[in-house]
Each structure stands twice: as structure tokens, then as C-alpha cells.
Design a protein with these regions (language model features):
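P-loop NTPase motor core
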Residues: 22, 38, 75-136
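Conserved P-loop NTPase "ATPase switch" module shared by AAA+ and STAND
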Residues: 171-202
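Walker A/P-loop-proximal flanking segment of P-loop NTPase domains
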Residues: 3-78, 83-92
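Amphipathic alpha-helical segments of the small helical/lid subdomains adjacent to P-loop NTPase cores
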Residues: 236-243, 250-321
């Protein structure tokens, strides 16, 4: 049995490596004996790729750590530390000819002030600091007076980059430029439509950002030998690439599908390694079963569909860290606040989605049907974000949908996992709260608890019905069934006791909503639910509603007999419910019995 120590009141194994949650510095990771999932095998492929490498992935997916790893590998100053940094890793045994041969210039545009009114000053400051640090780090390779002359001759970052490239060429040194979060300021633009004109000024013609990337392009003809650029959106790339037209976007390449994030094999190895030195209360397989629905299922290449899906690495490390620090208990919440996608970005997406002229809400369709069909666009300009395929592609790049196959020439996209589903539903609900209307969270939680532990479901679904009617607009009512279904799903997704599964595909057919109980987290909960949700127009008669109830009752009985449902409910008591809306009024909310209920409520407008 492993020797155990106590640290901050929590048991930790003496031999276990540190969990690198939130760590973006590769050298620090290696020096502090942190666990590292080896991605160095991709260095060979990156070297064989175009000299200017563009790579787009969702935020908090491990991009910055990968960039840091590459910087340490290519840095000429780290030559003597190569064995220390890369011993035991793939590239340590298989080094490439270009290792430790570059002067590395790292720039992180996340530090640039996103305000367009002073964007030039922010970009100048970011690049100036980067170049000054560069000159200090590599002073033994550069002319002695390079900083003095640069200050005398250069007015901004465009001039500085040109000057630096020319000086390095004189002394026969090669630069590897890394730009992390190149599109950081674009998020502000997309969230605020009023800034679109200024955005175009920066990225087109004589715009300053455009001029900077033109300078990067020019420098590649001298000492700037390699460029590696990352971000989360292809929008700015499209607006810049007509000037910077030597870069290649490898974001959708099957060769780099696994460059960031974890494969299931990597997650399994990670858990196995920690289980060997920590007193886990669960098997590796049990932990995988808990993690997979929440963190897995990203696919970034059409060619890789059905072969390899990716886990969000930050989510996995956060889960493992909380699991160990809680005494090896499954965390009560599978979602950590730092993982949530930027609030303004989601609101922007929903706003654009609601403003489609054709009134075909992609997000509404995604929530209601569970999938959408479309074409994945590699890059597109900001002014064309409302084109359906462009908008869908933006959802993909942000990590809100993922590839799930193809059909009749179109790609099929789904929500990848429960963490993303929670975010979409949460912010979708926020769009119904824009008129100073708020949910009574405390009351809602109490109702959810009674449903999970006492089988008292009617107050909870009545609460949803009241909220639905309260927040519905005339446009929402026109959407009818899609609105009712989407709103109900969004509300049930906020219930901490269940994982709502929409349109459950099994041998019995399709169930509208299965509230799968999170028994691994709430071991004492007693009740689970499968809900057949029906909708009819506001002028539907009571007799027609009762006929609809009989149809729903037959359907929900078949769903309840499926193996998937039986396995998921575990020791809970499964309630088979029928909920019927007439317009925006809930007129039936009954547990399945053998006689039709009385139809309640009056017909509402819809």
C-alpha cells in the first residue's frame, strides 16, 4: 500500500505527479514533476507542414501549453536543457534536425486591449514588450545596439517587426514567431455589432492589424522562418489572409485532430497512472463512464469521424483534481466555472441566431431535434456571419457543436457533451430574461429536490410551464412545438439531479425527454422520469387532447421498457409522465395510468 501524506487536510499519495490543471508553461510543468500527456509526436508533422501554421480550437483546450512545448523545443537558448525537458517523451528519443535552432518570438494577443478606439496602442504595446524581451533573451546573438537603434528608427510594432527581421538576417539568425489568441479582439467585435465598421478598418486595406500581418508576410522572405498562429475563430483569419496569404489552416486536418485535447486512450492511461498511486474509490472504467458524457465527443476532422473523439483536456484535469481533493468522491458538479465559454460570446451567437431573416433558428433546431445539417466552412468574413453555414461553422469552431457524420452531401452536427449542452441551455434561458424577469432559483431548487427525493413532479413542471408562458414572445409562440420543447429542455438541464436526454434513440423509438438520474453523485436519490412531451395548437379541443394523451401514453410505455432506460435508472423509481401543452398552456401533467386525465387549464394564445 502506498505511503500517504496529509496536505491541507486531504490525503495525497507520496508518489503521484502534480495535476497540471490551468498550467500553460511547459518548462514549469516539467520542473515541478507534473503529469504530461505526450503531444511531442506531432512536432515531426508540424515541421513537415507549411512554414506558416494556423490552428483553431475552442478556448481552454490546451493550445497554450502546446505552444509553450513547441517554444521550449525550438528555443536555441534551451539547447543545454533539452534532455531535462524532453527526457521520456517521444521527441526526446526522436529529435528533429530543427530542434533548438531558432530565436523564439512569443506574442499573446490576449494582452491586447480589445477596445477598437485604442487598439493600435494596445497592439504596439503587446508587440513592443515581446520584442524587447526577445532582444534581451538573445542579446548574445544580436547586434549590441539593436534596442537603441530600434527605439530611434521605429514608430510602432509594424516598423519594429520589420527592423527585427532585418537585423536577425544580418547575423544569420532565424526567428520562429508564435502568436497565441490572434483573434482575441474579434470576440469584442462580434459581441458588439456597433464595432463592425471599426473592425473592418483594422483588418482591411490600411488597417493596422492588417499592416502587422503584411509585415509578418514580408519578414518570411528574410529571417522569419516559421510562424505558428492559434485562436478560436476563423473569422479574423479570413479578413486577414488576402494579405497574409502564405499561411495554411490545419484546423480541420485529420493529421492534427489529436494535437490538443485528450483521446480516450490518453484519459484511460492518465486515470490508470493515478489509480496506481492513489486510493481511488472507483475503477478506471467507472470514472470513464462518469466523465465521457460530460467531456468527450469532440471531432475536428470529417475524416476522423467514427475513429477518434477528443476529450476537453482542461475539463478532464479539473475533474481529476477535484476528485482527488474531495477524498476520491465524484464531484457534485461536473462543470467548473472557469471552463464556461465567454458569456458575451454565447449571447452574440444567440442574438445572431434569433435575427436570421429566414426565421430558421439553428440553435432552436439543435436543441429541439438534437442535430442540424449543414456544410463546414473553413473560414469566412465577419460580415457574413449570418449565412447559415457560416454561423453553424462558427458554432463548430467555438466547440458548441461537433461532427457526427454526413448525410446526402451535408455534415451532421450535434452538441458534443453535457457541459456544452448546459452552457447552451443556460444562455438560451438568459434570452428570456431580458425584460428584468428572473427565475426564483431557490424555489426552483427546492422543487427539483422534491421531485428527485419524493416523487413530487407536478410542482416542478408547473413551475416550468409558468416560466414558459411568462417569458414567451409572440415570435416564440409562433414557433409552437419547437419553442415548448426547447424551453423545457433548457429548464430541465438546470436541474442538478438529472442529465436530460432529448429524443432518446433506442429500440422503442424516440422519447422527448429522459431525466437520467445522476446516482453516482446523489447516491440517495429515489426518483427518475421519462417524459413524453406533446404540443397542440391553442384551439385544440379537449377530446383531441385526450386522444393525444392516449398516443403519448403508449409511446412512453415503450420507451420505459428499453434496456438503456432500465440500466440508467439504477435503483430509482421510474415515473412515466405525459405532459401536453395547448399553445403555451400546460393542460396535462400526469403520471401514466390507465385512464385519461381531465384536461386542465384554458386554451392560451399561441
Amino acid at each position: 500500500m502506498e505511503q500517504m501524506n496529509r496536505h491541507d487536510g486531504m490525503p495525497t499519495a507520496a508518489k503521484r505527479k502534480r495535476i497540471p490543471y490551468g498550467l500553460m508553461n511547459f518548462m514549469t510543468l516539467r520542473e515541478r514533476n507534473c503529469y504530461y500527456v505526450d503531444k511531442t509526436r506531432f512536432i515531426e508533422s508540424i515541421e513537415e507542414a507549411n512554414m506558416c501554421f494556423f490552428f483553431i480550437r475552442p478556448r481552454r483546450f490546451g493550445k497554450s501549453l502546446t505552444i509553450s512545448m513547441l517554444q521550449n523545443y525550438y528555443d536555441i537558448n534551451k539547447k543545454e536543457q533539452f534532455d531535462k525537458l524532453f527526457d521520456g517523451l517521444y521527441i526526446g528519443e526522436n529529435p528533429t534536425p530543427e530542434r533548438n535552432s531558432y530565436l523564439v518570438l512569443p506574442l499573446n494577443f490576449a494582452t491586447v486591449d480589445a477596445g477598437l478606439d485604442n487598439y493600435r496602442a494596445g497592439l504596439d504595446n503587446c508587440v513592443n514588450i515581446g520584442i524587447l524581451n526577445f532582444c534581451d533573451r538573445y542579446k548574445q546573438y544580436l547586434p549590441d545596439d539593436i534596442i537603441v537603434r530600434m527605439k530611434e528608427e521605429c514608430q510602432g510594432c509594424v516598423d519594429q517587426l520589420k527592423f527585427l527581421a532585418a537585423e536577425c538576417e544580418k547575423v544569420n539568425q532565424h526567428i520562429y514567431l508564435f502568436i497565441d489568441e490572434y483573434d482575441h479582439f474579434t470576440n469584442k467585435i462580434l459581441a458588439e455589432p456597433k464595432h463592425m465598421v471599426r473592425y473592418r478598418e483594422q483588418t482591411h486595406g490600411e488597417g493596422y492589424l492588417r499592416m502587422f500581418f503584411d509585415a509578418v508576410k514580408d519578414a518570411t522572405s528574410s529571417s522569419l522562418t516559421r510562424v505558428f498562429v492559434t485562436g478560436v475563430s476563423p473569422v479574423t483569419m479570413d479578413d486577414l489572409t488576402s494579405g497574409f496569404n502564405i499561411g495554411t489552416n490545419y484546423s480541420l486536418s485529420y493529421e492534427f485532430n489529436e494535437l490538443v485535447g485528450f483521446t480516450e486512450e490518453e484519459v484511460r492511461t492518465l486515470l490508470t497512472d493515478y489509480a496506481a498511486v492513489c486510493p481511488f474509490n472507483h475503477t478506471v472504467e467507472e470514472l470513464i463512464c462518469n466523465m465521457k458524457p460530460w467531456f468527450d465527443n469532440y471531432c475536428f476532422s470529417v475524416e476522423e469521424y467514427g475513429k477518434t473523439t477528443m476529450y476537453n483536456s482542461v475539463m478532464v484535469l479539473n475533474f481529476l483534481d477535484r476528485y482527488i481533493r474531495s477524498g476520491y468522491q465524484i464531484p457534485k458538479s461536473m462543470i467548473e466555472t472557469n471552463i464556461r465559454i465567454d458569456y458575451d460570446k454565447i449571447r452574440m451567437l444567440i442574438r445572431h441566431d434569433k435575427n436570421f431573416d429566414h426565421d430558421a433558428s439553428i440553435i432552436q433546431e439543435l436543441v429541439t431535434k438534437g442535430y442540424v445539417m449543414g456544410n463546414l466552412v473553413e473560414n469566412f468574413p465577419a460580415e457574413r456571419i449570418n449565412d447559415p453555414d457560416n454561423f453553424l461553422s462558427l458554432l463548430f469552431y467555438f466547440g458548441l457543436v461537433t461532427i457526427d457524420g454526413s448525410y446526402r452531401g451535408y455534415s451532421r452536427f450535434i452538441i458534443p457533451n453535457e457541459v456544452v449542452r448546459d452552457q447552451i441551455y443556460t444562455y438560451l434561458l438568459d434570452t428570456y430574461k431580458e425584460n428584468d424577469l428572473t427565475f426564483e432559483e431557490f424555489d426552483k431548487d427546492k422543487l427539483a429536490s422534491k421531485m428527485a427525493y419524493e416523487g413530487d413532479f407536478k410542482p416542478y413542471f408547473t413551475y416550468i410551464a409558468d416560466s414558459l408562458k411568462k417569458f414567451s414572445s409572440q415570435r416564440d409562440r409562433q414557433k409552437g412545438e419547437a419553442y415548448v420543447h426547447g424551453f423545457t429542455l433548457a429548464m430541465t438541464s438546470q436541474c442538478k439531479f438529472y442529465r436530460p436526454i432529448s429524443e432518446l434513440d433506442n429500440e422503442g423509438g424516440y422519447a422527448d425527454i429522459f431525466l437520467s438520474p445522476l446516482c453516482d453523485i446523489y447516491e440517495d436519490m429515489t426518483d427518475s422520469y421519462i417524459v413524453e412531451l406533446k404540443y397542440c395548437k391553442s384551439n385544440t379541443s379537449d377530446a383531441q387532447v385526450q386522444k393525444l394523451f392516449k398516443e403519448a401514453a403508449a409511446q412512453v410505455s415503450r420507451y420505459a421498457d428499453s434496456d438503456l432506460v432500465k440500466e440508467s435508472v439504477k435503483t430509482t423509481r421510474l415515473h412515466q409522465l405525459v405532459v401536453i401543452y395547448r399553445g403555451v398552456d400546460m393542460v396535462v401533467c400526469e403520471e401514466l395510468k390507465y385512464e385519461c386525465p381531465d384536461v386542465c387549464g384554458a386554451a392560451g394564445g399561441a
